[in-house]
Every structure is written in structure tokens, then in C-alpha cells.
Amino acid sequence: MTIENFNVDRLSLTLYAADTADRPLVVLHNYAGDGSAVMAALKDLHSPDLNLLCIGNLNWDHDMTPWYAPPLSPEDTPCTGGADEYLPLLLTEILPKAKERISGIPPQVGIAGYSLAGLFALY
């Protein structure tokens, strides 16, 4: 496995590229970190070889939300509904740059996330 860090726009990306060609690509949106804990957990679980692209430095309450939602508490921030703005960046810039860096063509591309990133993955 090779690990490569790169940026697209304001985003920090970490690609854990599979040693074998033509392995699936999983895109994981992170609130914090580079996904190293996720990759370690996958290894511990004896996961099949895959490419993992971790995307960080997101504007979490904007990029991951499809619609506006007010704050849940006085200390919270609103969700501002920027998923429609972020999705084209993911599809036209981030994914092509990640695919350039992996071996072969991924037979599947999946998207994963937790919390608001899980909502975005379903969106």
C-alpha cells in the first residue's frame, strides 16, 4: 500500500492506494484526521485489498448537508445546505485526481461517512 497526501481546492485528501490493480475505491469523508485509524481497523479485520480516499478539512455543516437546518442548540451552528455545491467538486475534481493515483480501474466506487457525512453519502 502507498499513502499519498494531496489537496483539491481547500480540502485535504489522503489516499491509501492498494498494491493490487483494479481494486474498489471507497471515499470516506472525515470530520477530523486522515483516516489512518479506519485503515488500521480494516487491516485488523482482514479486509480485502481496496483503495481508501479520506477527505478532510470540510466545511462540515455546509458541505455535507443537502438543505438548511437551524441549530439544534444555542451553542450549535446551522446546517447551511451546501451539498449541491460540494457534489460537483467531488465528481469532477476529487474523484478523477484520486483515480489517476491508483493502479487500474476500480470496479466499484463507494462513498461512506458518519454523522452528516452519512447523510451526504445517502444524498
Could you say what each language-model-derived stretch is?
Residues 1-24, 50:
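A domain-start/cap signature at the N-terminus of enzymes
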